[in-house]
Design a protein with these regions (language model features):
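Proline-centered helix-kink/hinge sites
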Residues: 14, 48-49, 56, 102, ...
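Loop/turn elements at helix/coil->beta-strand transitions in domains of secreted/extracellular proteins
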Residues: 35-38, 68-71, 98-102, 135
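Active-site-proximal beta-strand/loop segments in catalytic clefts of secreted hydrolases
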Residues: 42-44, 75-78, 106-108, 145-146
Length: 190
């Protein structure tokens, strides 16, 4: 398992830059979620690893943890096939898969940049990606690809047990990475 990038470790999480939201009456901000552990799950609707592993994991986290202590946020971050993964397609996907957690749509500033704004700010390598943000708003874990439920649960539990001012390492033990293909069973890389 790849650890949080050194440049991002324990830094304040960049605010989410979105063009819209689903499953929430108001746009969410990380500032409004201070005091909670934030689980940010990024995905694309045509990413096999997202559909098979990442999204079901986000649903399990949302079901198992107290929403007053843990906020699960999905971020639809499209870096390929933009014409078929717009808001309408996402709304159908969210309905069909019965996703209940809030989902932001990563803001895309056109083909010149290629990668959406939040994905770029977090230096993500592809989808699915998992980011854990502590109660003070700092990035504590950042990983491209699938992370086991046990490792994620361990990390969330460690963050929940911290006092607001503490910042200990919550990275679970390392395992092997993904293959070299752009899309495999773990996700789609840039």
């Amino acid at each position: 398992m790849k650890e949080t990038k050194d440049a991002l470790r324990a830094s304040m999480a960049p605010e989410l830059q979105t063009s819209g939201w689903l499953n929430t009456p108001e746009p969410l901000t990380l500032a409004s979620l201070r005091g909670k552990v934030v689980v940010l799950h990024t995905f694309q609707i045509f990413c096999p690893g997202c559909v098979q592993m990442g999204i079901p994991q986000a649903q399990r986290i949302a079901q198992e943890f107290d929403p007053s202590r843990v906020a699960v946020i999905g971020l639809h971050t499209v870096f390929e096939h933009h014409e078929v993964m717009g808001r309408d397609a996402l709304e159908v996907f969210v309905y069909e898969y019965r996703l209940r957690f809030p989902i932001g749509i990563d803001k895309y500033d056109g083909p010149a940049q290629g990668v959406p704004l939040t994905m770029r700010a977090y230096q993500m390598q592809g989808t699915p990606s998992l980011v854990l943000i502590d109660k003070t708003g700092r990035i504590r874990f950042h990983k491209f690809g699938h992370v086991s439920d046990l490792a994620v649960g361990f990390s969330i539990g460690a963050l929940l047990s911290e006092e607001m001012e503490e910042t200990t390492d919550v990275t679970p033990p390392t395992t092997t990475g993904t293959g070299n293909t752009p899309c495999d069973e773990d996700g789609c890389s840039i």
